[in-house]
Amino acid sequence: PDPIPGSVRAEYGLIGFRQAVQEIHFPESREQMETARDRLAFEELLRLTLALKFLKGRGREKTRVRVQRPDLKPFVKSLPFPLTGAQKRVIAEILRDMASPYPMNRLLQGDVGSGKTLVAAAVSYAAIQKGYQAALMAPTEILAAQHEKTLRKFLEPMGVKVGLLTGSLTPKQKTAMREAIERGEIQMVAGTHALVQEATAFHRLGLVITDEQHRFGVHQRQMLGEKGDHPHVLVMSATPIPRTLAL
């Protein structure tokens, strides 16, 4: 059945879904292609709007994760370069969200190389400073390892213990890392889907960061969030797509 009711299609002059799919791929005229495109775009925007309404309502659940008045001065002083104006602004906005009684759901969008991981490290340090753990999940082991290396560079000078959990670790290495995470010894962990497996438990997860650069699964992001008590969520993306925008 067509996901858009006939009454709505009639009101907005939209063609049916099957017809739109057929004509967007095999249009007999430019007008036919534009009509099909309008129909599919309408549905995409409708789905996005409904998802936003649902998530805004769900977001009223309160969180116990309150990151209030963190001191980032030591972190900023440890950096070999000054933060840009945009980085300062974004960090301030994220920290304001994390101080709220409601769980944050925020998209951090920026081109590759724009410093998104530095921003993630800064807000992770704020959460860790208040006794929480932070986790960054990436869709590939290579990307997870890159993030772990960058996070280690920024956070280890601050005394933060950073770990990596991926599927390629030996069973013994995985067990040791998971035990350290559960005990709270690892304060910041980067990893892949191994982070959401049932065997992985956190001591006090307060911030979930995911890298959507390669369209990481929304379901897996939600599974990681369920490892904590309504933790704050930050999604990093170079090119936001409708799914990542619907936070």
Locate the predicted segments by residue.
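Conserved pre-motif I regulatory segment
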Residues: 62-109
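Conserved SF1/SF2 helicase motif Ia
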Residues: 105, 119-149, 156-161
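Post-DEXD/H (motif II) to motif III coupling segment of the RecA-like Helicase ATP-binding lobe
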Residues: 202-207, 213-247
